[in-house]
Regions:
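Loop-centered beta-sheet repeat module
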Residues: 48-106
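Conserved blade-ending motifs and adjacent loop-strand segments that build the rim/top face
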Residues: 69, 109-145, 149, 175-183
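Structural motif
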Residues: 1-3, 42-49, 95-101, 163-171
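Repeated scaffold domains used in trafficking and secretory/extracellular systems
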Residues: 20-30, 69-80, 121, 144-149
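Short coil/turn segments that connect the beta-strands within blades of beta-propeller domains
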Residues: 32-34, 85-87, 153-155
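Intrinsically disordered, low-complexity segments enriched in Gly and acidic/Ser/Thr residues
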Residues: 152-183
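Asp-box/WD-like beta-propeller blade repeats and closely related beta-sheet repeat scaffolds
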Residues: 1-46, 58-70
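Beta-strand initiation motifs
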Residues: 9-13, 55-58, 105-108, 177-181
Protein backbone atom coordinates (compact mmCIF):
# COMPACT_ATOMS: atom_id res chain seq x y z
CA UNK A 1 0.00 0.00 0.00
CA UNK A 2 1.49 3.32 -1.06
CA UNK A 3 0.86 6.26 1.28
CA UNK A 4 0.58 9.85 0.09
CA UNK A 5 -0.32 13.17 1.68
CA UNK A 6 -3.98 14.20 1.84
CA UNK A 7 -3.73 15.81 -1.62
CA UNK A 8 -2.23 12.67 -3.14
CA UNK A 9 0.89 14.49 -4.32
CA UNK A 10 3.74 13.76 -1.89
CA UNK A 11 4.74 10.13 -1.39
CA UNK A 12 5.01 9.35 2.34
CA UNK A 13 6.02 5.69 2.22
CA UNK A 14 4.58 2.25 1.72
CA UNK A 15 3.09 -0.45 3.90
CA UNK A 16 4.04 -4.03 3.17
CA UNK A 17 1.14 -6.31 3.94
CA UNK A 18 1.64 -9.85 5.23
CA UNK A 19 0.92 -12.75 2.88
CA UNK A 20 -2.30 -13.47 4.81
CA UNK A 21 -3.63 -10.16 3.42
CA UNK A 22 -3.46 -10.50 -0.36
CA UNK A 23 -5.25 -7.21 -1.14
CA UNK A 24 -6.66 -4.28 0.81
CA UNK A 25 -9.60 -2.68 -0.99
CA UNK A 26 -10.29 0.05 1.58
CA UNK A 27 -8.39 1.26 4.61
CA UNK A 28 -8.27 3.93 7.27
CA UNK A 29 -5.54 5.02 9.68
CA UNK A 30 -6.42 4.36 13.31
CA UNK A 31 -3.29 6.18 14.46
CA UNK A 32 0.22 6.87 13.15
CA UNK A 33 1.26 3.21 13.20
CA UNK A 34 -1.99 1.24 12.98
CA UNK A 35 -4.33 0.76 10.05
CA UNK A 36 -7.70 -0.91 9.63
CA UNK A 37 -7.85 -2.70 6.28
CA UNK A 38 -11.02 -3.91 4.58
CA UNK A 39 -10.11 -6.87 2.38
CA UNK A 40 -13.08 -8.01 0.29
CA UNK A 41 -11.29 -10.91 -1.43
CA UNK A 42 -9.84 -12.38 1.75
CA UNK A 43 -11.17 -15.71 2.98
CA UNK A 44 -12.64 -15.49 6.46
CA UNK A 45 -12.37 -12.16 8.27
CA UNK A 46 -12.53 -9.16 5.95
CA UNK A 47 -11.21 -6.57 8.43
CA UNK A 48 -7.62 -6.61 9.57
CA UNK A 49 -6.00 -4.31 12.13
CA UNK A 50 -2.32 -4.05 11.21
CA UNK A 51 0.60 -2.47 13.10
CA UNK A 52 3.06 -1.19 10.49
CA UNK A 53 5.98 -0.86 12.94
CA UNK A 54 5.64 -4.36 14.35
CA UNK A 55 4.60 -5.67 10.90
CA UNK A 56 1.92 -7.83 12.42
CA UNK A 57 -1.83 -8.31 12.48
CA UNK A 58 -3.22 -7.15 15.83
CA UNK A 59 -6.77 -8.37 15.29
CA UNK A 60 -9.18 -9.41 12.58
CA UNK A 61 -12.97 -9.55 12.34
CA UNK A 62 -16.02 -9.42 10.08
CA UNK A 63 -16.35 -12.83 8.50
CA UNK A 64 -18.71 -12.64 5.52
CA UNK A 65 -18.77 -14.81 2.39
CA UNK A 66 -16.64 -13.50 -0.51
CA UNK A 67 -19.46 -13.79 -3.04
CA UNK A 68 -21.32 -10.92 -1.32
CA UNK A 69 -18.58 -8.55 -2.48
CA UNK A 70 -18.14 -9.86 -6.02
CA UNK A 71 -21.50 -11.23 -7.15
CA UNK A 72 -24.10 -9.07 -5.40
CA UNK A 73 -24.98 -5.41 -4.93
CA UNK A 74 -24.91 -5.77 -1.13
CA UNK A 75 -21.45 -4.32 -0.63
CA UNK A 76 -19.82 -0.91 -0.34
CA UNK A 77 -19.62 1.39 -3.32
CA UNK A 78 -17.33 3.79 -1.51
CA UNK A 79 -15.41 3.43 1.71
CA UNK A 80 -17.25 1.61 4.50
CA UNK A 81 -15.45 3.92 6.96
CA UNK A 82 -16.00 7.47 8.10
CA UNK A 83 -14.71 9.52 11.01
CA UNK A 84 -16.99 11.41 13.33
CA UNK A 85 -16.01 12.88 16.71
CA UNK A 86 -12.51 11.42 16.27
CA UNK A 87 -13.88 7.87 16.11
CA UNK A 88 -13.69 5.50 13.18
CA UNK A 89 -17.16 4.34 12.12
CA UNK A 90 -18.03 1.37 9.91
CA UNK A 91 -21.26 1.01 7.93
CA UNK A 92 -22.52 -2.46 7.09
CA UNK A 93 -23.68 -1.92 3.54
CA UNK A 94 -26.26 -4.66 3.21
CA UNK A 95 -28.48 -3.40 6.09
CA UNK A 96 -27.08 -0.01 7.09
CA UNK A 97 -26.04 -0.91 10.65
CA UNK A 98 -23.38 1.47 11.96
CA UNK A 99 -20.54 0.52 14.30
CA UNK A 100 -17.72 2.41 15.97
CA UNK A 101 -14.29 0.84 16.05
CA UNK A 102 -13.03 0.72 19.63
CA UNK A 103 -10.37 -1.45 21.31
CA UNK A 104 -9.83 -3.41 18.09
CA UNK A 105 -13.47 -4.44 17.79
CA UNK A 106 -16.76 -3.25 16.30
CA UNK A 107 -19.23 -1.71 18.75
CA UNK A 108 -22.87 -1.27 17.58
CA UNK A 109 -23.99 2.37 17.30
CA UNK A 110 -27.11 2.48 15.09
CA UNK A 111 -29.43 -0.32 14.00
CA UNK A 112 -32.31 0.42 11.62
CA UNK A 113 -35.45 -1.65 12.10
CA UNK A 114 -37.51 -1.75 8.91
CA UNK A 115 -39.73 -4.50 10.29
CA UNK A 116 -40.70 -6.98 7.57
CA UNK A 117 -38.44 -5.06 5.17
CA UNK A 118 -35.25 -5.84 7.16
CA UNK A 119 -32.68 -7.46 4.89
CA UNK A 120 -31.06 -10.69 6.08
CA UNK A 121 -28.12 -12.21 4.21
CA UNK A 122 -28.16 -15.54 6.04
CA UNK A 123 -30.20 -17.27 3.31
CA UNK A 124 -28.12 -16.02 0.38
CA UNK A 125 -26.12 -18.59 -1.57
CA UNK A 126 -23.08 -18.37 -3.83
CA UNK A 127 -24.85 -17.77 -7.16
CA UNK A 128 -23.81 -15.94 -10.33
CA UNK A 129 -23.69 -12.18 -10.79
CA UNK A 130 -26.58 -12.51 -13.26
CA UNK A 131 -28.65 -14.28 -10.62
CA UNK A 132 -28.10 -11.46 -8.12
CA UNK A 133 -28.75 -8.80 -10.75
CA UNK A 134 -32.25 -10.27 -11.17
CA UNK A 135 -32.58 -10.97 -7.42
CA UNK A 136 -31.91 -7.31 -6.54
CA UNK A 137 -34.78 -6.17 -8.81
CA UNK A 138 -37.26 -8.81 -7.60
CA UNK A 139 -36.87 -10.52 -4.21
CA UNK A 140 -34.22 -8.11 -2.92
CA UNK A 141 -36.35 -5.08 -3.85
CA UNK A 142 -38.77 -6.04 -1.05
CA UNK A 143 -36.15 -5.17 1.57
CA UNK A 144 -34.18 -2.10 2.67
CA UNK A 145 -30.60 -2.78 1.56
CA UNK A 146 -27.53 -1.52 -0.29
CA UNK A 147 -26.72 1.47 1.89
CA UNK A 148 -24.50 3.37 -0.54
CA UNK A 149 -23.82 6.72 1.10
CA UNK A 150 -23.89 8.06 4.63
CA UNK A 151 -22.95 11.15 6.57
CA UNK A 152 -23.17 12.18 10.21
CA UNK A 153 -22.92 15.48 12.04
CA UNK A 154 -23.82 16.67 15.54
CA UNK A 155 -27.55 16.69 14.75
CA UNK A 156 -28.25 14.12 12.02
CA UNK A 157 -27.26 10.79 10.58
CA UNK A 158 -28.30 10.52 6.92
CA UNK A 159 -28.04 7.51 4.60
CA UNK A 160 -29.19 6.51 1.10
CA UNK A 161 -30.37 2.97 0.47
CA UNK A 162 -32.31 0.82 -2.00
CA UNK A 163 -35.89 -0.35 -1.51
CA UNK A 164 -38.66 -1.16 -4.00
CA UNK A 165 -36.30 -0.52 -6.96
CA UNK A 166 -35.78 3.10 -5.86
CA UNK A 167 -33.26 4.93 -3.75
CA UNK A 168 -34.53 6.27 -0.45
CA UNK A 169 -33.10 8.59 2.19
CA UNK A 170 -33.05 7.82 5.89
CA UNK A 171 -32.67 10.87 8.11
CA UNK A 172 -32.20 10.30 11.84
CA UNK A 173 -32.46 13.28 14.20
CA UNK A 174 -30.13 12.46 17.08
CA UNK A 175 -31.65 15.10 19.36
CA UNK A 176 -35.29 14.06 19.04
CA UNK A 177 -34.39 10.36 18.48
CA UNK A 178 -36.82 10.30 15.54
CA UNK A 179 -36.25 9.29 11.96
CA UNK A 180 -37.92 9.86 8.63
CA UNK A 181 -37.58 7.92 5.37
CA UNK A 182 -38.39 9.49 1.99
CA UNK A 183 -37.52 9.26 -1.70
Amino acid sequence: VFRYDSLGQDFKGNISLPLKVSAAHRFIALNKNTYLFFCEARKGNKMVVYDIDQKKIISEMYNLPRFLFFKTFYHHTYSPFYIYENKVHFVQSYNGDVFTFENNSLVPKYHWDFGKQNFDISGLKDESYEYYNKYARTVGAKYANTFISYVENSRYYIARFAYDNKFWTLMYDKQSKKHVVFN
